[in-house]
Amino acid sequence: ALREQKSKADLAAMVSKANYRLLLAQDDNSVVGFSIVFVAGSESFCLLEYMAVDKSHRGGGVGSELFEQTIGAVHRSNVAIPILLEVDSDREPSPDQVQRRRRQNFYRRLGCRRIAGCTYILPLPGENAPPEMDLFVYVPGLAPTIRRGELEGWLKLIYRDVYGCSADDRRIAIMLDGVSDPIDLA
């Protein structure tokens, strides 16, 4: 969705911060993709904020390789910490429904799992409702469940450190309202 896209200036400011990692995918010295990852100060998890591959290079393994490189960059200094992903839901009627489904399937093929029962609320500026999102998680050898308290901690840090919202933002309670404990990964 266009509302969730950041400007070039916002992206540049983001990657200049110590808790962000930027990775580039190149082909013949041309950038054909990139990923930006936020690593929590506690290094207990990270958030894949952006991952994009040029349309002309999709379907050729560039995205899969970029994801693997991103995992390697995060896990190089940390032991297999969870990587969270904010992914457009494929359950919401949308003109880009096919693309949403492909994106979800892409991340599933790479080993990511959706956090069941959590309809993620992206804290976007403005009055309009944000697009319906799912929260995915990736950890090699991850158990089929996570604890509700763990998810709550991740959400509070994301809202505070990534989006500049209060860790007590009411939207966090709304997201947690539909999840069980332990939470299944779909």
Residue spans of the language-model regions?
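A conserved beta-strand-loop-helix scaffold within acyl/acetyltransferase catalytic domains
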Residues: 1-57
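Short amphipathic alpha-helical segments and helix-helix/interface helices
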Residues: 11-12, 71, 104
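Glycine-centered flexibility sites
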Residues: 33, 61-63, 111
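Short, well-structured alpha-helical interface segments that form or flank functional binding sites
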Residues: 43, 61, 65, 98-102
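Long, contiguous hydrophobic alpha-helical segments, chiefly transmembrane helices and signal peptides
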Residues: 48-53, 66, 106-107
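Conserved acetyl-CoA-binding loop-helix of GNAT-fold acetyltransferases
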Residues: 53, 59-76
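Terminal substrate-recognition subdomain of acyl/acetyltransferases
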Residues: 75-186
